[in-house]
UniProtKB/Swiss-Prot annotation:
The keyword Acetylation does not apply. It comes from Rhodnius prolixus. It is found in: Secreted. One of its GO terms (biological process) is neuropeptide signaling pathway. The keyword Secreted applies. This is Tachykinin-related peptide 5.
Amino acid sequence: APACVGFQGMR
């Protein structure tokens, strides 16, 4: 699974 789906990669 991707690490930037809209919670951890948007930091």
